[in-house]
Amino acid sequence: MAAPAAGPVFWRRLLGLLPGRPGLAALLGRLSDRLGRSRERRRRRSPWLLLAPLLSPTVPQVTSPPCCLCPEGVHRFQWIRNLVPEFGVSSSHVRVLSSPAEFFELMKGQIKIAKRRVVMASLYLGTGPLEQELVDCLESSLEKSLQAKFPSDLKVSILLDFTRGSRGRKNSRTMLLPLLQRFPERVRVSLFHTPNLRGLLRLLIPERFNETIGLQHIKVYLFDNNVILSGANLSDSYFTNRQDRYVFLQDCAEIADFFTELVDAVGDVSLQLQGDDTVEVVDGMVHPYKGDRAAYCRAANKRVMDVIHSARARQQMLHAQTFHSDSLLSQEEAAAAGDRRPAPDTWIYPLIQMKPFEIQIDEIVTETLLTEAERGAKVFLTTGYFNLTQAYMDLVLGTRAEYQILLASPEVNGFFGAKGVAGAIPAAYVHIERQFYSEVCSLGQQDRVQLQEYWRRGWTFHAKGLWLYLAGSSLPCLTLIGSPNFGYRSVHRDLEAQIAIVTESRSLQQQLHQEQEQLYLRSGVVTSATFEQPGRQVKLWVKMVTPLIKNFF
């Protein structure tokens, strides 16, 4: 094995010589992870050769970055830091939430005690009484910051999608106008407009469907140095009976700074809501749908990548001085010097996907994780909308890990019971699910790849992400949590962000395991009989239309 390992070692050593070239370093890191794969491994990516795993009993050779290639030997996923900043934290600062009500109450509580910043990125803000409670909390905190004996400099920044946030007479914009009008120097509302919705298309496509072209889909809720990453939007159902996932990162200043800068960057290339309900472009910025598309996308790419590169450089410098230095002080010496920060046992990696701006970090990392999942590993993958990209489907079908995929039953799909064409969307998902299940069966992989449908009376399902259990382990060491759904839209159309959490902490692993179990306990295994149930018969027109529209949802 020494010879095959020589290539990856060589490339990895080159990374240390490229501190000022993160893009090239990331590319070399990617290459090093790919070197040494067998010919069979490379061929398996082809959809024509999905039978290869069935024809050969040998285990494909995988070159996951082993601990011996990482000087500090922390974990096998350190290759991700070749692409994005790595944040080392104590697991005691990470809390997994379980319910919409817990998510809602935590947000309100955090807004009330925020002193410096509140940053919220979401698809939209709803217009009901619960959403009004959030707005009232923001108003109260801003008011207190002005009237306090020692006034604070509290600033509020909100990033939403333009099309979704402008729909209807009463909408996200009208909900936030009072804040803008009362605190114009302290409140910023940015509305992202995809550069792909422009010209004649923008004029002709109906309001209800214009969001299919592309969206701001990032869900980050940040209060001073505390951050909630989720897939949940700011709407009443997400506070009551729409199941999602949520993780709370407490007292994580570097992570909070990163996501503040990311939201600021996207905000700078978005339209700015004014107190009279008009919108304006930031001075010097190309207009997203009136200006030159290529120039706008280049500017947006630079703005976002500057955030990623600068944060990555900061973290590399911090790690060189602390966790990753050969001259690292002992814990006793550090405590004596006044540094009481606990040693990290958990690592956070922000994964950004903005294909319109040619940023595809999340896609690269997700594909690599699926590719490197070895025989004996278990991957629990969940999505509220089962519409995997072809690349993800090929990897699920072509690798050796066990997969349990959790998806929404038609009754808990967010479009169930909708009026008009949208009411047929659950049936389209059933059709996609059945096609995938048929492919699993045709390859004889029912024991390795299992589909499960979530069902809960009176609830809908919106959870997404994955949990990775290494071979021989009963607890997950990695999870992905955030906004991506693993579908075409998430990869190609929308702006997405999630985090990879890698942990050696048994207590945090147990939290993640319990989260996974709670979701999967409310599911049933999909079999051929599932598609014979009443209500699962898909109309012919839906079957015919689905291939044409599946890239839009």
Curated annotation (Swiss-Prot):
Modified residues (Phosphoserine): S46
InterPro entries in the cross-refs: PGS1, PLipase_D/transphosphatidylase
Main location, first listed in the record: mitochondrion
Subcellular location per the Swiss-Prot or TrEMBL entry: Mitochondrion
CDD domains: PLDc_PGS1_euk_1 (cd09135), PLDc_PGS1_euk_2 (cd09137)
Residues annotated as catalytic: H217, K219, D224
Regulation of activity: Activated by calcium and magnesium and inhibited by other bivalent cations.
Residues that bind ATP: A121, S122, L123, Y124, L125, G126, T127, G128
Alphabetically ordered keywords of this record: ATP-binding, Lipid biosynthesis, Lipid metabolism, Mitochondrion, Nucleotide-binding, Phospholipid biosynthesis, Phospholipid metabolism, Phosphoprotein, Repeat, Transferase, Transit peptide
Pathway note: Phospholipid metabolism; phosphatidylglycerol biosynthesis; phosphatidylglycerol from CDP-diacylglycerol: step 1/2
Protein name stated in the entry: CDP-diacylglycerol--glycerol-3-phosphate 3-phosphatidyltransferase, mitochondrial
Reaction(s) catalysed (UniProt annotation): a CDP-1,2-diacyl-sn-glycerol + sn-glycerol 3-phosphate = a 1,2-diacyl-sn-glycero-3-phospho-(1'-sn-glycero-3'-phosphate) + CMP + H(+)
One Gene Ontology term, aspect cellular component: mitochondrion
Protein family according to the UniProt entry: Belongs to the CDP-alcohol phosphatidyltransferase class-II family.
Annotated organism of origin: Mus musculus (Mouse)
Record's function text: Functions in the biosynthesis of the anionic phospholipids phosphatidylglycerol and cardiolipin.
PANTHER family registered for this protein in UniProt: CDP-DIACYLGLYCEROL--GLYCEROL-3-PHOSPHATE 3-PHOSPHATIDYLTRANSFERASE, MITOCHONDRIAL, CDP-DIACYLGLYCEROL--SERINE O-PHOSPHATIDYLTRANSFERASE
Molecular function via GO: ATP binding; CDP-diacylglycerol-glycerol-3-phosphate 3-phosphatidyltransferase activity; hydrolase activity, acting on ester bonds
